[in-house]
Design a protein with these regions (language model features):
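N-terminal glycine-rich flavin-associated loop
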Residues: 72, 76
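Hydrophobic or amphipathic alpha-helical targeting/insertion segments
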Residues: 77, 88-103
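N-terminal glycine-rich anion-binding loops that anchor highly charged ligand groups
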Residues: 25-29
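Active-site-proximal helix-loop-helix substrate-binding element of RNase H-like nuclease domains
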Residues: 98-101, 107-113
Length: 275
């Protein structure tokens, strides 16, 4: 997919949930970021603008944030990594967008050196507190998610460092903010580099048993659904496969092998009211 096609896909995604979005300003942010990053490359060798586009896509597709957030996501690295200034972004776009971009840059500069549980919790609280506008931390988490998705281009040392940060800082914050799908993906991607053998073992098992687990999940879901109907309880039952890190953590906590973990399925019961 070309850069232009990726941008058009972003616009399509935003239009799907916010047709009144300011697409003129969003395009201006894209064009400004593309020009600012024009001489920069990712570790993969791709043009750097691929990254802000991907972050904006996550902000739109996963979080469905407003126009300002999309613009800030596209611009999130221009103050940190190019000659662009806060004043320039403020003048061309808005003071709010400039503050969002500067806020993301400030979070990027924080050094993570401690591993003490209490200090890690304080660091998580500090990150949230520093984000006077909650959209700052949402954009930063989206930034980290895309970086984790493309971590294969980094050195092994960098992979482990960023994965540990992600597991200890960003996944818990995502959980705290109710971003469950992003939290799961951050955990799985971190596990991939922190324990590649354990990760591959679990993923291979899930892939080999996928249809079996799907059938099992469907049968149990029907049983739960039927029983709740008998009780005249208005409800919705969701079933999903447990993600690799969830299984890995259970193996560790219960000191069991993968073959001893028999419940790869999780259920959520949403109860509206009794009739």
């Amino acid at each position: 997919m070309t850069i232009q096609e990726q941008y058009e896909n972003l616009e399509k995604t935003v239009r799907g949930y916010n047709p009144a979005a300011d697409f003129q300003h969003i395009r201006a942010a894209f064009e400004f970021a593309a020009e600012a990053h024009k001489d920069q490359k990712r570790k993969s060798g791709e043009p750097y603008i691929i990254h802000p586009l991907a972050v904006a896509q996550i902000v739109a597709e996963e979080l469905r944030l407003d126009s300002e957030s999309i613009e800030a996501a596209l611009l999130h690295d221009v103050i940190e990594d190019t000659a662009a200034t806060h004043e320039q972004v403020s003048k061309l776009f808005s003071p709010t967008i400039a503050d969002l971009v500067e806020g993301v840059s400030k979070l990027t500069r924080i050094q993570y050196a401690t591993k003490e549980d209490e200090q890690m919790e304080n660091l998580r609280k500090m990150l949230i507190a520093m984000s006077k506008d909650i959209r700052v931390i949402l954009i930063k988490i989206s930034d980290r998610l895309h970086n984790m998705r493309t971590m294969e281009y980094q050195s092994p040392a960098k992979q482990k460092q960023k994965s540990l940060e992600t597991m200890e800082i960003y996944a818990p914050i995502a959980h705290r903010l109710g971003m469950q799908r992003i939290k799961w993906e951050l955990e799985d991607l971190s596990l991939k580099y922190l324990d590649p053998i354990g990760y591959e073992e679990i993923v291979s098992k899930l892939e080999a048993k996928h249809q079996e687990y799907e059938d099992f999940m469907r049968r149990i879901q029907i049983q739960i659904d039927d029983r709740l109907k008998e009780l005249d309880i208005d409800h919705i039952v969701y079933g999903r496969m447990k993600h690799p890190y969830s299984i890995y953590r259970k193996m560790f906590n219960q000191n069991k092998s993968l073959d001893e973990i028999f419940d790869p399925v999780s259920y959520t019961h949403l109860r509206a009211h009794e009739t």
